Amino acid sequence: MSADTDRTAPPVEILLVEDNLGDARLTREALKEGKVYNNLHWVKDGVEALDFLHKRGKYKDSPKPDIILLDLNLPKKDGREVLQEIKSDSRLMRIPVVVLTTSKAEEDVLKTYTLHANCYVTKPVDLEQFIKVVQSIDNFWLTVVTLPNGK
C-alpha cells in the first residue's frame, strides 16, 4: 500500500475470485499500491467463492466483502453461475461485482450485465496494462464511488 493509505479507517474487504495464480499475484501487487487500505481475500473457483460468501466450511469466519472481483471462466462453478447466485441473494445482491476476465465475447458482456454485474473489464495481456487496469478499478470503486456499508 502507498504511504498515503489511510490505515485509521477499517480496511475495505475485497474478494478476488480468480483461478490464474499469476493474475491473482498481479492483482494483489496492484492493490497494495492503492490509496485505500484493503484486505484481499483470494479464492480459486466458483465453489470456493460461494463458500466464502455464505461463510461455509473453512470460510465460516470470513468477512462480508465490500466488493468482488470475479473472473468468468472458473473451475467447478462458472463465474456466471456465481454472479447469478450473488445477485439473487438478498444478503449479497448489493455487493458490487466487477467482472475481470479475458473474454471479449459480446455474449459474455451481455450475459453478465443481464445478471446485474456492476461492470465488465477485459484483462489486458500486457503486464503493465493489467496493473493499470486493476489500479483504475481500485481508484474508481474504492476511492471515487460511495459503497453501501455492508458491515
Language model regions located:
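Conserved phosphotransfer cores of two-component systems
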Residues: G57-P63, K87-R94, L115
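Negatively charged, flexible loop motifs adjacent to catalytic sites
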Residues: N20-D23, P75, R91, S103-E107
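Non-catalytic signal-transmission and effector/linker regions of two-component phosphorelay proteins
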Residues: M1-L16, N20-H41, V47-L50, H54, ...
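Hydrophobic residue at a beta-alpha junction
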Residues: L74-K77, I86
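Active-site residues of response regulator receiver
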Residues: D71, T101
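Short, glycine/charged-rich "phosphate-handling" switch motifs in NTP-dependent
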Residues: N118
